[in-house]
Amino acid sequence: MKHGSVPATPEAASLVFGDRLEAAELYARILAGAGVEWGLLGPREVDRVWERHILNSAALGELMEPGERVADIGSGAGLPGIPLALARPDIHVTLIEPLLRRSEFLRETVTELGLDVTVVRGRAEDREVRDRVGEMDVVTSRAVASLDKLTRWSVPFLRDGGRMLPIKGERAEVEIEEHRRVMESLGAVDARVVRCGANYLSPPVTVVDARRRAAKPGRNKSGRTARSRGRTGRR
């Protein structure tokens, strides 16, 4: 894939990516080259590709546990999923992207970086995609949609107690209050704002952290009881 020129690697990158720093630097060049050429990154973003995009995404790794299965919905150029996979090789990342051209970019990028990352083309809200991806511990996203829509797309992927961790902006706390009722009706509870990367990013990354409520005994994930599924009605 086409590589572009990027600013000098910030010192924080070596701390975040460790022995995968060279792969992170390669990803930065891919974003600056093919990413711009394919329309996935604006040309003006190249100068801040590290702080605004790569380190910003990788900071999310502070919230992950070893071995967790993480889905990045609406992955686009691979943000936040690819930096997250580079920073945290002990988790498994799946990138979900509905557009063909973008999913091709993701597959080529993952191959060039040598990452064990799964790319699934499809819409997060489609049942077929959920069946292919399977149950996740975490669902994340970045600049994809409003919090109510993200909840509707994210919760069906999550195991009971799993977390949705979308990267949000300065209005995150306001957005939680605006959509809390809808989120809770969809099964996302205990929503709060957390911040990551404070040691090397200014401002730090703002993330909404919400947990999938455990299903009540006797209910499946759609909310229907086993008894109601088997009921045939009176004759």
Swiss-Prot record:
SUPFAM superfamilies per the record?
A: S-adenosyl-L-methionine-dependent methyltransferases (SSF53335)
Q: Does the keyword Metal-binding apply?
A: no
Q: Where does this protein have compositionally biased stretches of type Basic residues?
A: 213-235
This molecule's function is given as: Specifically methylates the N7 position of guanine in position 518 of 16S rRNA.
Provide the top EC class. transferase
Keyword annotations of the record: Cytoplasm, Methyltransferase, rRNA processing, S-adenosyl-L-methionine, Transferase
Task: Identify its protein family.
Answer: Belongs to the methyltransferase superfamily. RNA methyltransferase RsmG family.
Q: What is the E.C. number?
A: 2.1.1.-
Please name the InterPro entries in this protein's record: rRNA_ssu_MeTfrase_G, SAM-dependent_MTases_sf
MF-aspect GO terms? rRNA (guanine-N7-)-methyltransferase activity
What is the annotated localization of this protein? Cytoplasm
Main location as per UniProt: cytoplasm
Record's GO cellular component terms: cytosol
Name listed for the protein in its UniProt record: Ribosomal RNA small subunit methyltransferase G
A Pfam family reported for this protein in Swiss-Prot or TrEMBL? GidB
Q: Where do the segments described as Disordered lie?
A: 211-235
Cytoplasm as a keyword?
A: yes
Could you say which residues bind S-adenosyl-L-methionine here? G74, L79, A124, E125, R142
The species this protein belongs to is Mycolicibacterium smegmatis (strain ATCC 700084 / mc(2)155)
- Name the domain of life: Bacteria
Q: Name the gene for this chain.
A: rsmG
